[in-house]
Amino acid sequence: MSSSPEAETMECGISSSKVHDSKTNTTYGIIHNSINGTDTTLFDTFPDSTDNAEVTGDVDDVKTESSPESQSEDLSPFGNDGNESPETVTDIDAVSAVRMQYNIVSSLSPGSEGYIYVCTKRGDNTKRKVIVKAVTGGKTLGSEIDILKKMSHRSIIRLVHAYRWKSTVCMVMPKYKCDLFTYIDIMGPLPLNQIITIERGLLGALAYIHEKGIIHRDVKTENIFLDKPENVVLGDFGAACKLDEHTDKPKCYGWSGTLETNSPELLALDPYCTKTDIWSAGLVLFEMSVKNITFFGKQVNGSGSQLRSIIRCLQVHPLEFPQNNSTNLCKHFKQYAIQLRHPYAIPQIIRKSGMTMDLEYAIAKMLTFDQEFRPSAQDILMLPLFTKEPADALYTITAAHM
């Protein structure tokens, strides 16, 4: 293969580069490990993949230890396949539970809710890799399992099986090539057609779960998985919650998610609704469009600090705050409002990013500070950005790409 590196970043002995094969017109992302001298190909041209489609099975109640079945859902897209001993990073009970039905290929970093493994099904001659999430010690995946059992959408991670062994509950999920965070890091900023395709899939997933009375509460690039831009799914429903009485009226559902990507109302511990996911999806759209720009600063020292950073970076006008002055946003943060632009005008941090007008308009609408005026996922999907296919978008050059 004749190739030439296009970009490279270094950190702790690990570097990444993007190379292009002129003979096959193929772009690859490669991880280089200078410590052990290994290279790992992250991406090819994303050929049609059937990894997700071929992981089959019915979704029932959580199986007991005597059942040969297990359920599936994707949580972690990309790991160091086979370079780590499972026992070095995990609990022996989790390993035992997983090995009842799966061969462990490698272990991924434990998450806040459990241990995560790359596995193959025992007796499966295809050796197709899946992700198994195991929770031990009395913790439960019941809410996440219950939510995913009711989901059926091409852009939502599919729960195939779940099973219990003693006190350990396991969820089994298709293994995708990468998460969106990794994809952007290697390939970004992305061409406009890919941005639109991925965000359209994300918004479709959000419109679907919101219609079913579910708030995800942790929408971020690390929780979006893909084999190719046309095959993207929203995963990790561990922070998701159900709407009370199936109404989208803002209510107090408690704090959850990630400080860097949470909406203003959630950060302020005000009542919130499905619109909190739209804010987070707006940050995803911005991150795909403009690589290596940190929206609200790198240091997050709590929700108050994050809110002040949001107000400063977006130059939030006093008239953009909620009309209800009894909200925590108004009582504690309106004093930091800035009158440097007209109310609801596109913030300079977006305007100066060199993106198309349709794209900056969509991001600005999704990052509306007051949730009452923030559009729904279905509203955003009706914008021209998503209803019209970009003309030759692969070759659209903006200031952000220069």
From Swiss-Prot:
GO molecular function: ATP binding; protein serine kinase activity; protein serine/threonine kinase activity
Catalytic activity, as annotated: L-seryl-[protein] + ATP = O-phospho-L-seryl-[protein] + ADP + H(+); L-threonyl-[protein] + ATP = O-phospho-L-threonyl-[protein] + ADP + H(+)
Positions of region (Disordered): 1-21, 46-88
Enzyme Commission numbers on file: 2.7.11.1
Alphabetical GO biological process terms: symbiont-mediated perturbation of host apoptosis; symbiont-mediated perturbation of host chromatin organization
Cellular component aspect of the GO annotation: host cell cytoplasm; host cell nucleus
Post-translational modification note: Phosphorylated by UL13 homolog; this phosphorylation regulates subsequent phosphorylation of UL31 and UL34 homologs by US3. Autophosphorylated.
SMART domains the record matches: S_TKc
Free-text function comment from the UniProt entry: Multifunctional serine/threonine kinase that plays a role in several processes including egress of virus particles from the nucleus, modulation of the actin cytoskeleton and inhibition of apoptosis. Phosphorylates UL31 and UL34 homologs, two critical regulators of capsid budding from nucleus to endoplasmic reticulum, thereby facilitating virion egress. Modulates and redistributes host components of the nuclear envelope, including LMNA, emerin/EMD and the nuclear matrix protein MATR3. Phosphorylates envelope glycoprotein B (gB), probably to direct it to the cell surface.
Family in the record: Belongs to the protein kinase superfamily. Ser/Thr protein kinase family.
Protein name: Protein kinase US3 homolog
Species: Gallid herpesvirus 2 (strain Chicken/Md5/ATCC VR-987) (GaHV-2)
